């Protein structure tokens, strides 16, 4: 089972991630991790923090000579902005008398609920842990599983279809060709645009909408389209709720800050149509023995992968920190006031696509790995047989002519 944990505050010394359960023998480079971190920092509409930070992961354990060794992989991403926050975010020195407490919650944020839940007298701890800055650690963690899946022929990619009032009228004409080449080709094409949209005219309109929102002191949300290609039929299961692939993927996507909705394929559009216009008909023939002319199920039927590209759509709400603030009240005095502004982005939808790619990899929540275990097992069964042969040969003083690519999986 692969799982990960993150730690760290937005303005603390560093973010960290521990990935547990990675198979031994998975080839990795520093670029596999840091390239994904760089992608997360891109995107039109980002705030001033991106000019301060240049995220790079420092691997502390679990990798040797460019391959995982089966033990937990620990990584740290330093926060350059920490030097400006050593007093208000000090771990042990009690500087509370020098620091002005934040007692005005921002509507739409975790400020109020976190303040009440944990019994704080200052909102700062809530702000710093609930911040989407934490997703840098998740992208680093997800990059390990992405490298593993890539070696199994599975690719993950995304693009943006909607930013605020601007939407692509239909799926890009190039989408089928890009998916045939693998979802990473789709991601590479999207990355050419500062808003990660495929259509140039739509990209320009989205940039203009972001500029207008910034001028108005407002923010914009949008819709992320995630695709997973190369997934064989049968990943997931209908047998138990915690092995359902669509459930696991939806949970992973919904764990991302500011994501408020998720669907597999065009699910909400399908809900308005009769079944005869929704379900993907089956035809004998083709390379895999069957073929379909449509993929309205989004690559998942009966909570299992159908062998078609998996398609996940995620709705991101507008960021809650507004230059032109909404009404709130002071928790210390109960006085009605305008909400406060915390340095933030105007639009982070392009970056959300990168985070979504990371969390759908099997290093995301435990159910996702449970769903994929059967397929991973079948893909690696030859390696497992070789492990037994290696032991048998070792007893005889012999050596295998071919070593398994992946030696063990917990």
Curated annotation (Swiss-Prot):
Summarize where FMN binds, as residue positions: 129-131, 257-258, 302, 317-321, 343
GO BP terms? amino acid biosynthetic process; aromatic amino acid family biosynthetic process; chorismate biosynthetic process
Q: Which cofactor does it need?
A: FMNH2
Please name the top-level EC class of this enzyme. lyase
Task: Give the PROSITE patterns listed for this entry.
Answer: CHORISMATE_SYNTHASE_1 (PS00787)
The protein's annotated pathway:
Metabolic intermediate biosynthesis; chorismate biosynthesis; chorismate from D-erythrose 4-phosphate and phosphoenolpyruvate: step 7/7
List the InterPro entries hit by this protein, alphabetically: Chorismate_synth, Chorismate_synth_AroC_sf, Chorismate_synthase_CS
This protein's UniProt keywords: Amino-acid biosynthesis, Aromatic amino acid biosynthesis, FAD, Flavoprotein, FMN, Lyase, NADP
Question: Any keyword tRNA-binding?
Answer: no
What CDD domains does this protein map onto? Chorismate_synthase
| The reaction(s) this protein catalyses | 5-O-(1-carboxyvinyl)-3-phosphoshikimate = chorismate + phosphate
Self-association and partners: Homotetramer.
Q: Which family does it belong to?
A: Belongs to the chorismate synthase family.
Q: Which NCBIfam families match?
A: aroC, PRK05382.1
Protein name (record): Chorismate synthase
């Amino acid at each position: 089972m692969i799982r990960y944990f993150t730690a760290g505050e937005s303005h603390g010394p560093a973010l960290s991630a521990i990935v547990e359960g990675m198979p031994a023998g998975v080839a990795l480079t520093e670029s596999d991790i840091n390239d994904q971190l760089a992608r997360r920092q891109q995107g039109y509409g980002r705030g001033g923090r991106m000019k301060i930070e240049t995220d790079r992961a420092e691997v502390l354990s679990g990798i040797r000579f460019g391959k995982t060794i089966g033990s937990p992989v620990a990584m740290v991403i330093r926060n350059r902005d920490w030097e400006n926050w050593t007093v208000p975010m000090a771990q042990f020195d009690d500087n509370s008398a020098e620091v002005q407490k934040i007692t005005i919650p921002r509507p739409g944020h975790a400020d109020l609920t976190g303040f009440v839940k944990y019994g704080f007298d200052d909102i700062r701890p809530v702000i710093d842990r609930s911040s989407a800055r934490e997703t840098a650690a998740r992208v680093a963690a997800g990059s390990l599983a992405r490298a593993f899946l890539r070696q199994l022929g599975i690719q993950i990619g995304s693009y943006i279809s909607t930013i605020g009032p601007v939407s692509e009228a239909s799926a890009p004409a190039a989408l089928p060709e890009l998916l045939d080449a693998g979802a990473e080709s789709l991601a590479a094409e999207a990355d050419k645009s500062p808003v990660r949209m495929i259509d140039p005219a739509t990209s320009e309109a989205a940039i203009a909408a972001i500029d207008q929102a910034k001028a108005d002191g407002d923010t914009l949300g949008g819709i992320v389209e995630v695709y997973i290609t190369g997934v064989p039929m049968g990943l997931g299961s209908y047998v138990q709720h915690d092995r359902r692939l669509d459930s696991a993927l939806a949970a992973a996507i919904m764990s991302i800050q500011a994501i408020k909705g998720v669907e597999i394929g065009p699910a909400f559009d399908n809900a308005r149509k009769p079944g005869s216009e929704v379900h993907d008909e089956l035809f004998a023939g083709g390379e895999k023995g069957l073929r379909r002319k449509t993929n309205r199920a989004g690559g998942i039927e009966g909570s299992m992968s159908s062998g078609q590209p998996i398609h996940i759509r995620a709705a991101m709400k507008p960021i809650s920190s507004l230059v032109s603030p909404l009404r709130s009240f002071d928790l210390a005095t109960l006085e009605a006031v305008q909400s406060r502004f915390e340095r933030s982005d105007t639009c982070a939808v392009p970056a959300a696509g990168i985070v979504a790619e990371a969390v759908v990899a099997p290093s995301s929540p435990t159910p996702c790995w449970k769903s994929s275990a059967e397929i991973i097992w079948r893909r690696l069964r030859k390696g497992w047989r070789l492990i037994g042969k290696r032991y048998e040969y070792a007893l005889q003083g012999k050596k295998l002519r071919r070593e398994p690519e992946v030696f063990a999986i917990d």
